[in-house]
Each structure stands twice: as C-alpha cells, then as structure tokens.
Curated annotation (Swiss-Prot):
Protein name: HTH-type transcriptional regulator SkgA
InterPro entries, A to Z: DNA-bd_dom_put_sf (IPR009061), MerR-type_HTH_dom (IPR000551), MerR_fam (IPR047057), TipA-like_antibiotic-bd (IPR036244), TipAS_dom (IPR012925)
Keyword annotations of the record: Activator, DNA-binding, Transcription, Transcription regulation
SUPFAM superfamilies xref list: Antibiotic binding domain of TipA-like multidrug resistance regulators, Putative DNA-binding domain
Species: Caulobacter vibrioides (strain ATCC 19089 / CIP 103742 / CB 15) (Caulobacter crescentus)
Domain HTH merR-type intervals: 3-72
Length: 255
C-alpha cells in the first residue's frame, strides 16, 4: 500500500500543505500515522476521504457538515459518490446554461447579436437567493427586509456592464484577501485595509446605501454565521471566512 507525506499528498491532490494541516487540526482529515520526526503519513483511505472533502467543497458544503457526513456510522462511500454525481451533473447543466448566457452577453456587448433583457439572468439559482434572503430575515428581522428591498430597488436600474463589474470586483476582493491570508498579513495591515476599503464600497453599491461601521462589522459576522457564505469562502482558502470577518471588524473600528 502506498504511503504519502503531507507534501506528496499536496502535490497529488492540488490541496495546499497549509490546508492539509488545517484539516488535521480540526479533525476533518487526520493522517494515518505521525512519525517520530513529526511527519504526517497518509494512505489510500485518506486519499479517498480527501476526495470526498473536495467533492463536498465543490458542492458548497460547510466544513463542519462535511465532517459530520464522513464520520457518521455506516458511511457508504459508493452511495455518497452516486449522490454527489447526481448533484454535480445537475450543477454542470446549470453552469453550461450560465456559460451560454456569458457568451450571448459578450456577443451583445460586442454588437454581434441583440440579447433580450429577460435572458440576462437565465441559469442563476433563484432558490438559493430565496434561501439566503429568508435566512437574513429570520436572523435580522425587519431591518434585513428593508435592506433587501433597498438593494433590489437600486439594482433594478443596473445594466449588463454594471452586473459584470459588480461580480468581477467581488471575485477580485476575495482573491486578493485570500492572497493576504496566505501571506500572513495582519487584518489591520495597510494592504488588507486597502482591500477592505474596496469591499466597503462594494457593499455600499450592493445595499444602495453606504454601510455604517456597525452594519459592516455585522455583515462580517453574517459571513461566519451563514453556511452558504462559509462554504464559499472556505472553498477559496481554508480560514478565509474568519480572516474576512476579522478584517471587516478591524476596518469598521477605524471608520
């Protein structure tokens, strides 16, 4: 049976050594053995468990729920793979529709075809948005209801270019913050503060009003409390959710 060190495991799977250490620390993926020299060693069963973790992450499952699923008594790997295949196939179909919308939108912007406005949002998941809004209202009450209404009112006038820029900026902020995390930058460092300044502006655009410091810090708490946000950020980089939230609170304190 093949045995892998943590570096070999990282090269084989594409998961960083830092992430594997994090998974070990939280009990999600413990090495099969630890040598007298402190080296972690993994076997094929560990590879299959890591594969499961990555499938769950692709499906935006929160880390704590992944661990609960994998550690349940009588866990059936083959059954889990079949269920994941079904969900991934459905997701692939939705992504294919989104790719088609991207292509048609680009063709519209470049003057090659005219795209009806009603087709701009084909392929997006209205159920997911509805779940997110319901969660906000449940946890934050009437204030969340008002903010959702304000945001929707502001976005009604957005065109294709507005939506594209909004989404690209969100991805850029997440990418830059994940890079800061891997570099070990403090949340109140100048580079992270600059990223948070961009996020502050992005949130203001999303809400159709400038956030207060308390509201901005509260949004950071929401990122940690809401499973869908947690799944999104942890899929980008392990530990990003907490880092993002702390950076937002640090920025809010300085406003």
């Amino acid at each position: 049976m093949s045995v892998y060190t943590v570096k070999q495991m990282a090269r084989l799977s594409g998961v960083s050594v830092r992430a594997l250490h994090h998974y070990d620390a939280i009990g999600l993926l413990k090495p099969r053995a630890v040598g007298a020299n402190g080296y972690r060693y993994y076997d094929r069963q560990d590879l299959l468990r890591l594969q499961q973790i990555l499938f769950h992450r692709a499906l935006e499952t929160p880390l704590k729920d992944i661990q609960a699923a994998l550690d349940q008594p009588g866990f059936d790997l083959a059954a889990a793979l079949r269920a994941q295949r079904e969900r991934l196939a459905a997701q692939a179909e939705r992504y294919a529709r989104l790719v088609d919308v991207v292509d048609r939108t680009l063709a519209d912007l470049e003057g090659d075809e005219t795209m009806d406005d009603k087709h701009l949002f084909e392929g997006f998941d209205p159920e997911k948005q509805a779940r997110h809004e319901a969660w906000l209202v449940e946890h934050y009450g009437d204030e969340a209801t008002r903010r959702i209404a304000d945001a929707k009112a502001g976005m009604k006038s957005w065109g294709k270019k507005d939506w594209s820029q909004f989404q690209e900026e969100a991805k850029a902020i997440e990418h830059d913050l994940a890079k800061a995390l891997t570099q070990g930058l403090p949340v109140d460092s100048a580079p992270v503060t600059a990223i948070m300044r961009r996020h502050w502006a992005w949130v203001g655009r999303s809400w159709n009003r400038e956030p207060t410091p308390d509201a901005f810090a509260g949004l950071g708490h929401l990122y940690q409390a809401n499973p869908e946000f947690t799944a999104r950020y942890e899929a980008i980089a392990p530990g990003l959710t907490e880092y993002f939230s702390e950076a937002m609170r640090a920025f809010a304190r300085g406003r």
